[in-house]
């Protein structure tokens, strides 16, 4: 559910507040692209990729109206117990993406149930509009450079291979999103339809803490 502007904002905040070596991150650009990667083949953010893969597969999520990715399963499969030197920045970024989706999607499911709103098209539209507004409250400053290292790490992504042509499409899509988001940046807090500023603040803080603790633990093992 979070768009790439929200994923980028969490990644940028983490990189502002922590040193990359303490997080185990070696290439910032590759890590940033990893934060977009699970959406690449779903087709929503980058419609012109070579082929499509289902959200449930790329995000390790069961089919549901608001799916919640299993980020711990991804960690256990591709990070835990591995030689840190063999865990790429793309993999770390992809894990961060799943944390973000799981945090916001899970919180949204709970919130909707608590206030007694029934799932449906009207609820979906209200929810999507709120997330679109929330994403525009962030001003984004980092771009993903298209480098041989990025192409190589994507080709070696352990969950499924990423074609070079699709990496290029993804980088271009990220640039377009960043430019558009900054052009339409909201300096003042927006008025939401379904969710609330407190919902986004609390959920964002929880996501940040999971990201920080997980990557600090990885970075300590990598030292």
Annotate the PLM regions.
Residues 1-223:
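N-terminal leader/auxiliary helical segments
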């Amino acid at each position: 559910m979070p768009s790439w502007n929200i994923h980028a904002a969490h990644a940028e905040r983490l990189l502002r507040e922590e040193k990359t070596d303490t997080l185990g991150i070696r290439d910032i650009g590759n890590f940033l692209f990893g934060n977009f990667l699970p959406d690449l083949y779903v087709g929503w953010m980058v419609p012109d990729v070579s082929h499509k893969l289902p959200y449930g597969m790329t995000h390790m999520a069961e089919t549901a109206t608001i799916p919640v990715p299993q980020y711990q399963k991804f960690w256990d499969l591709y990070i835990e117990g591995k030689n840190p030197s063999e865990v790429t920045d793309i993999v770390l970024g992809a894990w961060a993406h799943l944390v973000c989706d799981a945090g916001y999607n899970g919180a949204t499911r709970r919130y909707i149930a608590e206030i007694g709103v029934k799932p449906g098209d009207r609820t979906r539209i209200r929810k999507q509009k709120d997330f679109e507004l929330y994403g525009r409250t962030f001003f984004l400053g980092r771009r993903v450079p298209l480098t041989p290292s990025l192409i190589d790490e994507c080709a070696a992504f352990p969950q499924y291979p990423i074609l070079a042509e699709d990496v290029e499409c993804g980088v271009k899509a990220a640039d377009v999103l960043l430019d558009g988001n900054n052009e339409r940046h909201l300096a003042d807090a927006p008025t939401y339809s379904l969710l609330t500023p407190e919902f986004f603040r609390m959920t964002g803080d929880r996501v940040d803490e999971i990201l920080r603790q997980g990557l600090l633990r990885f970075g300590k093992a990598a030292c």
